[in-house]
């Protein structure tokens, strides 16, 4: 599972600089740290809801608009548990930390879905709803 799609900035960084880092990293999440420990998460949703309508917020510190003390997971969480948690809490990103709170990466909903889809053979995904059903012509997607 790819956990590498994230950027990291120290607390106190301007929102504008964090957005530039997100753009350079080609990701939609930025983890905010203090002494290498996670203190918050800034997502594109935070930017859309708290900055897009108030452009002067580009110059404030990420600490003011980030989600502080975000829910985190450890690397041993199953893909099913991660998806359930993301669905239940309406998240698209889950920071992954070790037992000491050090950042390992960020788990995205897309990474989990891609991971699961890669493990199912194409034949299983394309089976007809009724196994005894035989199509008259070949269908496919």
Predicted regions and their residues:
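Tandem CBS (Bateman) regulatory domains
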Residues: 1-5, 43-74, 78-88, 106-141
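Short, flexible active-site loop motifs that bind/organize anionic cofactors or intermediates
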Residues: 5-8, 37-38, 72, 102
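The conserved cystathionine-beta-synthase
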Residues: 8-26, 33, 72-90, 97, ...
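A glycine-centered beta-loop-beta connector
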Residues: 22-25, 30-46, 86, 94-110
């Amino acid at each position: 599972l790819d956990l590498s799609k994230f950027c990291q900035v120290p607390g106190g960084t301007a929102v504008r600089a964090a957005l530039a880092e997100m753009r350079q990293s080609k990701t939609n999440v930025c983890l905010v740290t203090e002494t290498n420990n996670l203190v918050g998460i800034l997502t594109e949703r935070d930017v859309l809801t708290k900055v897009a309508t108030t452009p002067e917020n580009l110059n404030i510190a990420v600490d003011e608009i980030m989600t502080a003390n975000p829910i985190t997971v450890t690397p041993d969480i199953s893909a099913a548990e991660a998806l359930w948690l993301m669905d239940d809490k309406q998240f698209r990103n889950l920071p992954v930390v070790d037992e000491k709170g050090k950042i390992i990466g960020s788990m995205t909903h897309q990474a989990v879905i891609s991971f699961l889809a890669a493990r199912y053979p194409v034949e299983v995904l394309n089976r007809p709803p009724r196994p005894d059903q035989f199509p008259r012509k070949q269908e496919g997607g």
